[in-house]
A protein has these predicted regions:
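Signature for HUH/AEP ssDNA processing cores
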Residues: 1-118
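Histidine-centered active-site/metal-ligand motif
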Residues: 121
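DNA replication initiation modules
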Residues: 56-78, 83-85, 91, 98, ...
Length: 167
């Protein structure tokens, strides 16, 4: 419950998610709240639940989500297969992907969180955004998603293996 309180104190809306990262609330991220009573009811089994945070205008936060070790895709979003028909796993590290992203323009210093799968979330505070969640903002060969309006991310909860880099 300590991490729940941390987000509530920072006025960050949160909601309960199941261990498979799916929402544990009837309306998903639309049930996110900073009301302690509402949040505590959602987290009826906090040891088994993850903390979801709406992105976009719900919290005025946009997240760049970098995945590693995923199947590679071409610029049409189709998985790339080897000669045997098996998916080719992207060998790039987070830092290599960040370097490719920087070629598109500078990345401001921001809070970064290494996810349990080895990926990275880059958090950006925004006053208002018209950006929607999706992949269409980047070269589709980069394993990067934007989490904004219509999306959410799982945030550090003190139980999972997250590493926070706060520049």
């Amino acid at each position: 419950m300590e991490y729940l309180q941390k987000y509530i104190r920072q006025n960050i809306k949160i909601f309960a998610c199941n261990s498979d990262k799916t929402p544990a609330t009837p309306k998903g991220f639309y049930n996110a709240s900073v009301d302690q009573e509402i949040v505590e009811k959602q987290f009826h089994d906090p040891e088994k639940m993850l903390i979801g945070m709406p992105t976009g205008n719900g919290n005025n936060i946009v997240v760049i989500d970098i995945d590693v070790g995923k199947p590679m895709e071409n610029d049409h979003g189709e998985k790339i297969l080897d000669s045997s028909g098996n998916e080719i796993i992207d060998p790039r590290t987070v830092n290599e992907i960040l370097d490719e992203l920087k070629e598109l323009g500078p990345i401001p210093n921001t809070c970064q969180v290494e996810t349990p799968s080895g990926g990275r979330h880059l958090y950006f505070k925004v006053p208002f955004t018209k950006i929607n969640s999706g992949r269409r903002y980047f070269d589709k060969t980069l394993p990067i998603d934007i989490r904004a309006n219509g999306g959410y991310v799982i945030v550090p909860d003190g139980k999972s293996d997250y590493i926070v880099y706060d520049d």
